[in-house]
């Protein structure tokens, strides 16, 4: 299950773990779990 998700969301994972992730976490500190996952 994780292999398929990694391959399907491979580009999104990079964007999520990018500088945008820090900005989103700062904007939504109340939802750190959702921001980190999405």
Curated annotation (Swiss-Prot):
GO CC, one annotated term: host cell cytoplasm
Subcellular location: Virion; Host cytoplasm
Keywords, sorted A to Z: Capsid protein, DNA-binding, Host cytoplasm, Virion
Major location (coarse): virion
MF terms in GO: DNA binding
Keyword Transmembrane helix: no
Role according to the record: Mediates ssDNA packaging into virion, it locates to the internal surface of the capsid, thereby displacing the internal scaffolding protein during virion formation. Additionally, protein ORF8 plays a role in viral attachment to the host cell.
Protein family: Belongs to the microviridae J protein family.
Protein name according to UniProt: DNA binding protein ORF8
Organism: Spiroplasma virus 4 (SpV4)
